[in-house]
Amino acid sequence: WDDDVDIAMSRKDFEKLKQYQNEFPQYMFLDTIQQKGHQWTAAHVVDTRYKLEVGKGMKKATMSVWVDILIIDGVPNPGTFKYKIFSAAYLTARLLYKFSNFSNEVDLEKDRSAIETFFISFARITHIEKVINQHWAGCFIDWISRRYDLDKCEYGATLGSPQKMGETQPKYWFGKGKELLFEDIIVNGMEETENFLTKFYGPNYMTPPPLDKRNQHNVRLVEKIV
């Protein structure tokens, strides 16, 4: 289904990670949506020893290897008025952020819904990214994402994921985590894996989709410095 492993953590744990980033090796750093030049809705831990050519968006770019850090924030209960208002606010903020970095961030080769195709065409025609400050847009989406404390909510979501509000799920699904085998390493996954996989991939989630339907990053290793 995918070609990498993402790391999800609560907002509180992410704030702790930020406190300890000075203890990272010299070749690693934490890149967040609030920082100038950041290009994604997820935070990244970056390893500068490796360089990749990324064929995403209107421009090809060379960048260091990264791991996505997906922050779990609280959200209102689905179906409520608060959820609808929050969803509209978050999706508006996310759209502004995408517009602000359209040439580098938006994957033009990905299958899109009709509304997403419309906004992409709008951005290409109007060059709206020239009038939206990327740093402001990043701080705005971060401010919206923090509105609900996960500890006080029944539901949580990794809002920085591609599924956006579709990532909403009962908080108890995350639980305290359990060990899972991924290739040749052990990772700490959520407790309710069955519910999660069924929601996002359907009841036949053990059957991988065709190659052209899998989430692939379209990258090529161009430099290795060790």
Residue ranges, per PLM feature:
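Short, His- and charge-rich active-site/binding loops that engage polyanionic ligands
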Residues: 86-90
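A short secondary-structure junction signal
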Residues: 79-84
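Conserved catalytic core of two-metal-ion nucleotidyltransferases
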Residues: 21-77, 97-201, 207-226
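Catalytic metal-binding acidic patch
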Residues: 1-17, 184
